[in-house]
Amino acid sequence: MRPIAHRGCLTQYPENTLSAFRGSAPHVGMIETDVRRCGSGELVIFHDDTLDRVTDATGEVASTPMAVLEDVSVLGSGESIPRLTEVLEAVPEDVGLNLELKGRDVAAETVRVAAEYDHEVVVSSFYPDDVAAARDAGAETTAHLFYAEEPADFDVDRALDAAADLDCAYVHPDVDTCLETEVVEQARDRGFGVNAWTAETESEVLELR
C-alpha cells in the first residue's frame, strides 16, 4: 500500500500549496493535486472552480490572471496559488504525482509539461474525454476516477469496462465504493492498479489493505 497525500495532505498543510507538497513529500509515495487553467492561460494548481472557499479573493479561477493569483493567500497562510511547473520543480522526482485534470482544455498541455520532468505521473479525471485526451497526448499512465453517491447502485462492471476502453492503468474509486462494493477485487483481477480516495481514518486504511 502506498500513501498518497491528497492536495498535499490538506489536513496538515494549506491545500495545494508549495509548503504542502514540500512538507508531505518525505512521508508519501505520491502526491495528488489538481490542474486547471487560469485567466491568463497558465496551468495552475487549485481544486475549486472559484477562489472563494480557500483564499482571500473571490471569482472564478478561469477568469483570474496569474498576476492576481500570485497575490492571493491560501487559507491565511500567506502562500499563493502555484503554477504546475513550480510544483514539478518543488516535489522530489522520487515522489510520484497524480495530476487530476480540472477543466476540459488542460490535458494535452499538462502531459507535455509533466513530460519535461522525471516524476512518475498519473493523469486522472472523472471525465472519459479528458482521460482519452491525456492518452492521445502521450500520457504513459492514466486513471479514471469513480464516485458513487450510493455505492449499492454502483455498476462495477460498467465502470471497469469504461476504464479498460480508455486503456487506463489505474482506477480511483472513492473510499465508500471501495469498502461497500467489489470494485477493488474486480479491478485487481482485471489488472488495474487501485488508488482509493480519500481515507481519513486509521480504520479506513486498515480496511482497504
Show which residues each predicted segment covers.
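Extreme N-terminal starter segment of soluble prokaryotic enzymes
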Residues: 1-4
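Short loop-to-alpha-helix "cap/lid" segments that border enzyme active sites
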Residues: 90, 100-209
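Aromatic/hydrophobic pocket-lining residues that form the small-molecule binding cavity
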Residues: 17, 80, 84, 110
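C-terminal helical cap(s) of enzyme catalytic domains, especially alpha/beta-barrels
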Residues: 23, 43-44, 206-209
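Structured helix-beta-strand junction loops
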Residues: 27, 64, 72, 93-94, ...
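Entry/capping segment at the start of metal-dependent catalytic domains
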Residues: 8, 12, 16
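Catalytic domains of carbohydrate-active enzymes, especially glycoside hydrolases
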Residues: 20-37, 87, 163-171
